[in-house]
Amino acid sequence: MSKILLLIVKFYQYFISPLLGNNCRFHPSCSEYAKEAITIYGSTKGLWITFKRIIKCQPFCNGGYDNVPISIKNYKSLNKKI
């Protein structure tokens, strides 16, 4: 399931995002954030974290740097993958 979601995000990045322009108020962009969240947490929790991020990305938010939250447990498992 995660691979399918990552393909959807990549499709969005290459075909839809260029048409919309650079509108994300955060760094990394919401689509990059989604890729990281899905890679680290899997499809269910990654989608939930991404959903919360997209809700924050609106005109009344200042934006700024907002990285995917990484727990110590996930940090250790992420290092094993590398």
From Swiss-Prot:
Subcellular compartments: Cell inner membrane
Species in which this protein is naturally found: Rickettsia akari (strain Hartford)
UniProt keyword annotations, A-Z: Cell inner membrane, Cell membrane, Membrane
Protein name, UniProt field: Putative membrane protein insertion efficiency factor
SMART domains per record: Haemolytic (SM01234)
Function of the molecule: Could be involved in insertion of integral membrane proteins into the membrane.
Annotated membrane topology: Peripheral membrane protein
Entry keyword annotation includes Cell membrane: yes
Family: Belongs to the UPF0161 family.
Main location group: membrane
Organism taxonomic ancestry: Bacteria, Pseudomonadati, Pseudomonadota, Alphaproteobacteria, Rickettsiales
Membrane in keyword set: yes
Pfam families for this protein: YidD
GO CC terms, sorted: plasma membrane
